[in-house]
Regions:
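Phosphate-binding loop of NTP-binding sites
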Residues: 68-71, 80-170
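N-terminal leader/targeting and accessory segments in enzymes
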Residues: 1-101
């Protein structure tokens, strides 16, 4: 794990409790952050998806708008589906809160190197092919991002020398 100083001991709001939000919360807890999770859905609606977070020391603010969770936070990690211009994101930036996406946060904390693939067509094919090429070359390779496996999840146990091949939205 690298660059934990950006998050260790800080109050970090993670917005969106789908796969990438759950993994982001796990990685941030491992980095020593005081994690606050938020989703507009209540815990009952999220159901078993929150199970990976059961034994982690985090604060839950579920079933309420993210705008109501901004006071006292140092940083905010948003899920890939949250637009940069969402009102609560703009408000957080206005308040001086460090706002980043799950992908950037995972890169900052995970050991290893990243190759990011973006574009209009062919991203999934390219990412999958590169993953196989690097694996066959003997590299420990994680195919992550919009391909369905969160970078944060792979980053939990990453080692120096690991390679992340990441599909990124255009």
């Amino acid at each position: 794990m690298r660059n934990t100083e950006k998050y260790a001991g800080k109050r970090v709001l993670v917005v969106g409790m789908a796969r990438s939000g759950i993994a982001a919360a796990q990685l941030l807890c491992k980095a020593g952050a005081h994690v606050i999770i938020n989703d507009s859905k209540a815990a009952e609606q999220l159901g078993d998806s929150l199970k990976p977070l059961e034994n982690l020391p985090l604060e839950r603010r579920l079933g309420c708008p993210a705008m109501e969770c901004l006071d006292g936070i140092d940083a905010m990690v948003i899920s890939p589906v949250v637009p940069d211009n969402a009102p609560f994101v703009l408000k957080a930036k206005e308040m001086g809160v460090y706002v980043t996406g799950e992908l950037e946060m995972a890169y900052q904390l995970s050991s290893g190197e990243m190759v990011a693939i973006t574009g209009t067509n062919g991203k999934t094919t390219t990412v999958t092919l590169l993953g196989e090429i690097f694996r066959n070359a003997g590299r420990t390779t994680h195919v992550v991002g919009n391909i369905g496996y969160p970078y944060s999840a792979a980053g939990l146990d990453s080692q120096d020398g690991d390679l992340f091949v990441c599909e990124v939205s255009s």
